[in-house]
Amino acid sequence: MRIALCSYSQKEKETALLMKLGKVDRFDNGVFCVYAMQRDGPYDAVVVMEDGARGMNFCMSIRGYSRDVPLLWISDQAEFEPQSRRMQVDDFWVKPVTEYQLREAVSQLLQKTTRRNEPREEDE
């Protein structure tokens, strides 16, 4: 599984945790994440760990590229939750988030990817 971690700051602990779930690419700019998806195909999950307007900009860049890539936004500002719904973010969490919560949230996103990629009965 391929996971993108989008954050301006280094997230060593979170990166190490996500690496247990798949290959992690870290981006400090939403545009670079989109460029990587254009070049290499969509990620199985994208995790935005940036607060407020910066996090919203990451999400807008990613949603501008694809409405289908599973997207988790973690922010310290709960008031951005309505914007996350409007942008069709799959899951929005307010910090602090424990390692267990992060692992579970990303695992659920990856399960959505698996279900989306499974052939439907009518396709067979």
Set out the residue ranges of the language-model regions.
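Two-component/phosphorelay signaling modules centered on CheY-like receiver
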Residues: 3-35
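Alpha4-beta5-alpha5 "output face"
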Residues: 63, 82-86
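C-terminal output helix
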Residues: 97-106
